[in-house]
């Protein structure tokens, strides 16, 4: 399951997160409870939250 989780997170990072980087900066990850300095960092946390929960 953990390997699958990592693969899913990687796919999300490559496909969704890069396209959504501008939106991540705009909302500053407040919906996820995180305040990030970089869209990439913000995005990683979003993807892992989706994967874990």
Swiss-Prot record:
Top-rank taxon, per record: Eukaryota
Signal peptide: 1-24
Protein's name in the database: Conotoxin Cal6.31
Ribonucleoprotein found in the keyword field: no
Recorded GO CC terms: extracellular region
Tissue occurrence: Expressed by the venom duct.
Coiled-coil residues: none
Disulfide bonds: 29-43, 36-47, 42-51
Free-text comment on this protein's domains from its UniProt entry: The cysteine framework is VI/VII (C-C-CC-C-C). The presence of a 'disulfide through disulfide knot' structurally defines this protein as a knottin.
Keywords annotated in UniProt: Disulfide bond, Knottin, Neurotoxin, Secreted, Signal, Toxin
Compartment(s): Secreted
Predominant localisation class: secreted
Family the entry assigns: Belongs to the conotoxin O1 superfamily.
One GO MF term: toxin activity
Chain's role: Probable neurotoxin.
């Amino acid at each position: 399951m953990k390997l699958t989780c990592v693969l899913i997170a990687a796919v999300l990072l490559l496909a969704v997160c890069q396209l959504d980087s501008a939106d991540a900066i705009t909302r500053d990850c407040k919906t996820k409870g995180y305040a990030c300095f970089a869209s990439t960092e913000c995005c990683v946390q979003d993807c892992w939250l989706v994967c874990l929960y």
